[in-house]
Amino acid sequence: MEVEATEARSPGPCYKRSGRRYKCLFCTKTFPNAPRAARHAATHTPTDCTEEVREAQPKVDTEPKAEEASGDKVSASVAKPRPYACPLCPKAYKTAPELRSHGRSHTGEKPFPCPECGRRFMQPVCLRVHLASHAGELPFRCTHCPKAYGTLSKLKIHQRGHTGERPYACPDCGKSFADPSVFRKHRRTHAGLRPYSCERCGKAYAELKDLRNHERSHTGERPFLCSECGKSFSRSSSLTCHQRIHAAQKPYRCPACGKGFTQLSSYQSHERTHSGEKPFLCPRCGRMFSDPSSFRRHQRAHEGVKPYRCEKCGKDFRQPADLAMHRRVHTGDRPFKCLQCDKTFVASWDLKRHALVHSGQRPFRCEECGRAFAERASLTKHSRMHSGERPFHCNACGKSFVVLSSLRKHERTHRSNETTGAAPQQELVLGLALPVGVVGEGSAAPVAGAGVGDAPAGLLGLPPESGGVVATQWQVVGMTVEHVECQDAGVGEAPSTLGDAGEVGGEETDEKPPQFVCRECKETFSTLTLLRRHERSHPELRPFPCTQCGKSFSDRAGLRKHSRTHSSVRPYSCSQCPKAFLSASDLRKHERTHPVPIGTPIPLEPLVALLGMPEEGSA
């Protein structure tokens, strides 16, 4: 008997008694009795039980009675064969009910509904735990936040989100997890077990429920509704995170700056902004990212994959969130509203950017000239004016540009010239005028051979008293480089009189192939601006009428801007005078009429270097 006991205990079952339950020493699962714990332990390979577990085995059971009573059953169950194999994955089971229960993880079947709320579950034990939440039986409460759970294991998993503990590390890729079920699901991805494929985009998943969640991104189904604001979601986890916003719960707080977050992933991405860590490296271009979502989005840009298509207009998108935002263009839904001027927005970041207009905050300041900006991206573009950096290069001719939009406009000229065989148009650099002192006191040096002496002041939106600053080689500095075409041939005859600077007017512009088609009458236009101007002649393309004067508009934004003319709302105020305006663009135009205070330092060296001009302008 002593030899048999030693033989039975020498391998050591990978479980121990913990209170009134039996706990697996490999994955921390618990079971109500020893036979069930033993059956579960057999699912782990012998290598799963480490030497430390085997050494601790003689101390596991402190109650000899339970060990004696279950010893024979344990050894018998471990040695029992597994004749019931899953056809979809390598797992095998001893009994048919166990195989049927496992099969639900593949089929997504949830035959156990909750009589209170209708939520369904795969296993009866999960339903029992859920019913305890309806009865208010949540004895395990988190010490970090107000959440409570029906089981101790769920509480421990939740608390790891606060402590950052992730004890389950993947041996293949090093990724770690707090939840053992998520860890097991991740291991399947390395095994290549993804039997469920999306018929639309081909993306494959290890479980059917994940495929069902993914399919909602194509169909637009959002069955999880917020009872507070009516917003709907495609996943229950997204609804849970959203509800924290209403409850003002931000359980994940940054110790460095105090900022709170509703999701652990958002908190972890934020932490990298302090450390500067960018662990996600693109193998194609070497660019690095701090969060996985930006990295995946960047990879799709390389692959050109846009699997999410709008069913109304056929436009494709890389992200389901981009598709959901695009759908609001068709529905007119603008859920984000400014509390100060009642302006509404399609996206939350548009509202945040708009809020800076009212607050006047411009936290991003240029170290060279002191100019401040509301957004970091605007400061980055502005800084290129000082550094001369032009990171966007044309592959056809080698020209470089400050911003991506200018490169795209320039590339259209190559596409049109390939069709007509015409030479590229001369580009004019327009935008920000240099101070009058560069070219003389209020006088403009005319461009040689050009009859455009009176044009620049009006073209640039400058006040008449500025004298219309123009100099040789177009001594005007531009934030972007754009093609300038005369839309009205009779005004000034500027394009046709440029002479050697490039014949951009006359017959050459007429020979351009049309690119933009009117959706109503099919008439074609060479530029988007001309198309939009033409579409105003079609009443059916202006479906948004003003209820007060009957004037109609092609989009809702135009109607909202027009409606302010009937009311006294002028949300954009000038900081230098009492005037207020209906739109931010009107305010910016007005601000140019205020003279720059004498003594304001304006660095000219980077601007001169950008244009390649001599330091002293010719008078």
From Swiss-Prot:
It comes from the Eukaryota. Pfam families: zf-C2H2, zf-C2H2_6. GO terms for cellular component: nucleus. The modification Phosphoserine is found at S10, S387. GO terms for molecular function: DNA-binding transcription repressor activity, RNA polymerase II-specific; RNA polymerase II cis-regulatory region sequence-specific DNA binding; zinc ion binding. There is a cross-link at K59, K65, K80, K154, K512 (Glycyl lysine isopeptide (Lys-Gly) (interchain with G-Cter in SUMO2)). The modification N-acetylmethionine is found at M1. It is found in: Nucleus. The keyword S-adenosyl-L-methionine does not apply. Keywords: Acetylation, DNA-binding, Isopeptide bond, Metal-binding, Nucleus, Phosphoprotein, Repeat, Transcription, Transcription regulation, Ubl conjugation, Zinc, Zinc-finger. InterPro entries: Znf_C2H2_sf (IPR036236), Znf_C2H2_type (IPR013087). One of its GO terms (biological process) is negative regulation of transcription by RNA polymerase II. Residues 51-71 have a biased composition (Basic and acidic residues). A zinc finger (C2H2-type) spans 22-44, 84-106, 112-134, 140-162, 168-190, 196-218, 224-246, 252-274, 280-302, 308-330, 336-358, 364-386, 392-414, 516-538, 544-566, 572-594. The keyword Metal-binding applies. Residues 36-74, 491-513 are annotated as: Disordered. May be involved in transcriptional regulation. May play a role in DNA repair process. Belongs to the krueppel C2H2-type zinc-finger protein family. This is Zinc finger protein 668. It comes from Mus musculus.
